[in-house]
Amino acid sequence: MALDQAKKAEIIAKYARGENDTGSTEVQVALLTERIKYLTDHLKTNKKDHSSRLGLLKLVGQRRRLMRYLKNTDLERWHTIKDALGIRN
């Protein structure tokens, strides 16, 4: 797993909408983005690791679905999280 508890808690605290918020769309997208960054770096050095590449594609698809949901429900929150994380769409 790419994220240790301290890093995960830091991300949750940064993107949480409330005090006990750990599962909002923004938090999920931020956590997925960190895992995607980790796997991208991993695959730069381990080019033949096809199982990790498949996992990366699944994570990207999950993040895309969450971002689509957020865009359809609350466009302002979508713009905020997109700009904060540097995601294209």
Swiss-Prot record:
Alphabetical list of Gene3D superfamilies matching this protein: 6.10.250.3130, S15/NS1, RNA-binding
GO annotations of cellular component type: cytosolic small ribosomal subunit
Pfam families for this protein: Ribosomal_S15
InterPro entries in the record: Ribosomal_uS15, Ribosomal_uS15_bac-type, uS15_NS1_RNA-bd_sf
Endoplasmic reticulum among keywords: no
Subunit structure: Part of the 30S ribosomal subunit. Forms a bridge to the 50S subunit in the 70S ribosome, contacting the 23S rRNA.
Family per similarity comment: Belongs to the universal ribosomal protein uS15 family.
Name of the protein this chain belongs to: Small ribosomal subunit protein uS15
Gene behind the chain: rpsO
